[in-house]
Amino acid sequence: MNEDIKNNLNNSDESNGKIIVGLDEAGRGPVIGPMVIASVKINEKDLPRLDDLGLRDSKQLSKKKREELYTKISEICDVKKVVINPEKIDEQMEIINLNKIELGAFSKLANHFIKENENISIYIDACSSNEQSFSNQFKAKLINKNVEIIAEHKADENYKIVSAASIIAKVTRDNVIEEYKKTFGEIGSGYPSDPKTKKFLKNYVHENKGLPKIARKSWATSKNLLKEIEESKIFQWVK
């Protein structure tokens, strides 16, 4: 995991109030690019400053608006990110599932803040269908089991602090995708359902007889393309 840490919270006395942390991810499902886990920390007394930004789930915002909010959130909050590249995802998927990969990154970020603060509440977008099970698994990985945890589906829509984390994660991943395009050309959004992404991968695999390093080899889309290549080789040999 690569970490990108940005600490530019205004230096308010955090001992004077509860610390609020929001956690969310971007890039869970794509076949191309990293999964980004983001955390946003703020003193509870400063929450009105987030409310004033008019935050929503990142998926409901335009690219331009997300980028504007990314800057404003970074000025108000302490932001921390974990970027898990495709190679690392593939490596971990051999022994654990995607939920556990995500849980590991969530707990890594949460523990960073828990070390510094005892009076803390953590809001997190539950990546499991069972909210309570997810909350229990998350808590088991924390260095302080007494912190307050609010783990819910659609937390990015219901809590501004999680919306902020969602925006940080989404913009970070989008920036990585833009960097990829400088090398590989048009690759689309990276999602398997995106026609541009499917076209890019298919052309790349057929031209290079393998997947690009930016693709997740453990995804069904990737496996199917590689299978096509193998079947094509067999057909040519038989022919």
Curated annotation (Swiss-Prot):
Gene3D superfamilies associated with the record: Ribonuclease H-like superfamily/Ribonuclease H, Ribonuclease hii. Domain 2
Cellular-component GO terms for this entry: cytoplasm; ribonuclease H2 complex
Enzyme Commission numbers on file: 3.1.26.4
Cofactor(s) essential for the protein: Mn(2+); Mg(2+)
SUPFAM superfamilies, alphabetized: Ribonuclease H-like
Catalytic activity: Endonucleolytic cleavage to 5'-phosphomonoester
Keywords of this entry: Cytoplasm, Endonuclease, Hydrolase, Manganese, Metal-binding, Nuclease
Species annotation: Methanococcus maripaludis (strain C5 / ATCC BAA-1333)
Places the protein is found: Cytoplasm
HAMAP family on file: RNase_HII_A
Function: Endonuclease that specifically degrades the RNA of RNA-DNA hybrids.
Gene Ontology MF terms: manganese ion binding; RNA binding; RNA-DNA hybrid ribonuclease activity
Annotated cofactor note: Manganese or magnesium. Binds 1 divalent metal ion per monomer in the absence of substrate. May bind a second metal ion after substrate binding.
NCBIfam families, per the entry: ribonuclease HII (TIGR00729)
Higher taxonomy: Archaea, Methanobacteriati, Methanobacteriota, Methanomada group, Methanococci
Domain of life: Archaea
Binding locations of a divalent metal cation: D24, E25, D125
All residue ranges annotated as the RNase H type-2 domain in the record: 18-231
GO biological process: DNA replication, removal of RNA primer; mismatch repair
The keyword Ribonucleoprotein belongs to this UniProt entry's keyword annotation: no
First-tier enzyme category under EC: hydrolase
Name of the featured protein: Ribonuclease HII
Keyword Transferase attached: no
Protein family according to the UniProt entry: Belongs to the RNase HII family.
